[in-house]
Design a protein with these regions (language model features):
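Alpha-helical bundle segments that constitute or directly flank the non-heme di-iron/ferroxidase center
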Residues: 66-68, 154-186, 252-280
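Alpha-helical scaffold segments that form or flank carboxylate-/histidine-based iron centers
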Residues: 106, 110-113, 159-163, 187-203, ...
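Acidic/His metal-coordination segments adjacent to aromatic residues that form catalytic metal sites
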Residues: 142-163, 223-263, 320-328
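Long, hydrophobic, well-ordered secondary-structure blocks that form the structural core
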Residues: 150-233
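Extended alpha-helical coiled-coil scaffold domains characteristic of the BAR superfamily
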Residues: 168-171, 202, 248-277, 301-305, ...
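Alpha-helical scaffold segments in carbohydrate-active enzymes
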Residues: 194-215, 268, 297-312, 340
Length: 390
């Protein structure tokens, strides 16, 4: 018996030249892009993967924002901060049939001129954080093998279980509720990347301290891994820091949040605690491990997070259209946050007397912190507020 197979008549593919890569046009085979002006003579890899990834209907995106909020506004409104960059007051171009959909020439507003000097994007974040965690783990493993934790005296164990753990709450709160929130509200992808990396530095540091707390609970028999909760909730020395940190997380203006945290709080409170207390007192009390954990977070701020912050606000204080406006706003923020930071710093004074081996005097450390803070303000062309003398 013979069976016959019926030939099926399938539609033949028709190429319409609508598929990606079908058309040839000037620069269609280029490996670099020309829709923006690079900061330097040549475009960098960082700029190619960052600039205009977040669109702006003032430049292109002629159909407007693809999504919006319940109040009718779409995308990333520029009034989410009181600061302004040149071009901010220009309305979005009106698009209508026959207009050609043309927006303002690049960069449309001064916000797009910001470049993170750290050139942060996804790859750099993963690589950097992985290297830090790898080094911290190696340090802790070495300390375990050499029984280094046995060299700690009792007072230092108490100091670490209460105060290093308490600082973990600061890192977690600011990372998750201040920087992550500010990242979503910033108007360009260059800002988004820099701020989100700042957020992840904070969250990673909080995680480092939490895991370190668990390690110490295993390695030191008398170590109370829950003592930091009581210190954070009720120790008078920490209530100023706690109050200020919680106030920081409640800031609505994303520029104010970054400015208050990185320009005011960190130099006057964070570096005072980490550099002028923990790093100074730990070696004399037999602890050479804690400074490596705390120092990783200190390096994040001093060498990376502060660097992009200065670049971001320096651009605004020298803006060709709104420099005076921005300086006036920043002076107002300084008048609010400097007294709070100084008050939080002074509340930490009792911690300086707790270790057996004492760090340099509290007032000396605070003077250095104030000097550092003044240097940052000078870079931003801002005057020191009178509140700094408190």
């Amino acid at each position: 018996m013979t069976t016959t197979t019926t030939q099926r008549d399938l539609p033949k593919p028709e190429f319409t030249d609508a598929e990606a890569g079908a058309r040839e046009f000037p620069d269609s085979n280029a490996r670099r892009f020309s829709y923006y002006t690079p900061q330097k003579r040549k475009q960098s890899h960082y700029e190619d993967v960052t600039v205009e990834v977040q669109p702006d209907p003032r430049h292109y995106l002629s159909q407007g924002w693809l999504y919006g909020f319940s109040d009718g506004r779409g995308g990333y409104p520029l009034d989410w901060t009181a600061l302004k960059a040149w071009g901010s007051d220009r309305p979005e171009p009106e698009r209508f049939p026959g207009s050609g959909g043309r927006g303002y020439d690049w960069p449309a507003t001064g916000w797009h001129e910001f470049r993170d000097p750290n050139e942060e994007w996804e790859l750099t974040l993963y690589r950097y954080n992985a290297n830090v965690v790898r080094q911290i783990n190696a340090n802790i493993d070495t300390a375990r093998e050499t029984k280094a934790f046995e060299q700690w005296n009792r007072n230092w164990v108490t100091f670490v279980e209460r105060n290093i753990g308490a600082w973990m709450h600061v890192e977690h709160g600011l990372g998750l509720y201040l920087f992550a929130n500010a990242n979503r509200r910033a108007p360009t992808n260059m800002h988004n990347n820099a701020i989100s990396v700042n957020s992840m530095h904070r969250i990673r540091t909080a995680q480092d301290l939490a895991l370190y707390n668990l390690t110490l609970s295993e390695e030191i028999e008398s170590f109370d891994g829950a003592a930091h909760i009581e210190a954070w909730n009720s120790d008078p020395a920490w209530q100023g820091v706690r109050k200020t940190a919680e106030q920081l997380t409640g800031i609505d203006d994303w520029c104010e949040a970054i400015f208050a945290a990185n320009v005011v709080f960190e130099p006057l409170v964070g570096e005072l605690f980490r550099s002028h207390l923990v790093q100074q007192a730990a070696p004399g009390n037999g602890d050479f491990i804690t400074p490596t954990i705390v120092g990783a977070g200190e390096y994040d701020f001093a060498q990376r997070d502060l660097r992009y912050t200065i670049a971001m606000f320096e651009l605004l204080t020298n803006d060709r259209e709104f420099a005076d406006h921005n300086k006036a706003i920043l002076d107002q923020w300084l008048a609010v946050w400097v007294p709070r930071a100084i008050s939080a710093s002074r509340a930490l004074l009792p911690l300086w007397s707790q270790p057996d081996f004492k760090p340099p005097r509290f007032e000396d450390g605070l003077d250095r912190a104030k000097s550092r803070f003044g240097g940052i303000l000078t870079q931003l062309s801002l005057a020191e507020p009178k509140e700094l003398t408190q």
